[in-house]
């Protein structure tokens, strides 16, 4: 795990766009909504849309560079299943700490929420769930170099969006949190496994 995590950390910090691109995309979209001076009730919508688009864009490149330089194909052909799982987990962990957490903090501040560990954790879970779903689209469209398959994933997220709205807009933490957590478990298990299998097929 340490080796995979070290590699992802090096890639994140040695490639400038990995540092500034996610927060820049989120910031630009969010500022546009602020300039439009939308009603306070739409603060959630503006931050969610900004988060949604940001995760969608960065997920397009999750496997792109590793596929282009042959690392992904080599990894899938030479490594065992456990190494591939660690490879995917390392990518997610780096994004959690350096992309999702900053976005969650900024979003909660501008939504007027107190940054409690509970809401902060829920927001990170929300972003992680989006990440897994969009990574599936990225894996499917790896050789086609388009976002069509990622767009096809979006309808699967409609119930998820309703749950998140129930938490952050309606303030109904129960039972929405547990449904949201179930969505995260589904994404981090079944969707994660599907990503793994799709990548193995793509490497043939």
Model regions: which residues?
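Residue-level hotspots within the lipid-embedded alpha helices of multi-pass solute transporters
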Residues: 49-50, 58, 62, 92-96, ...
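Helix-loop-helix units of permease transmembrane domains in multi-pass membrane transporters
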Residues: 62-95
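Hydrophobic alpha-helical transmembrane segments of multi-pass membrane transport/permease proteins
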Residues: 15-40, 44-56, 151-164, 183-194
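Membrane-interfacial helix-loop-helix junctions in multi-pass membrane proteins
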Residues: 163-204
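Secretory targeting signals
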Residues: 98-129
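Aromatic- and glycine-rich beta-strand/loop motifs that create alpha-glucan
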Residues: 1-22
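A structural motif at transmembrane helix-loop-helix junctions in multipass membrane proteins
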Residues: 122-157, 203-204
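Selective transmembrane-helix segments that form parts of the transport pathway or gating/packing helices
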Residues: 82-109, 184
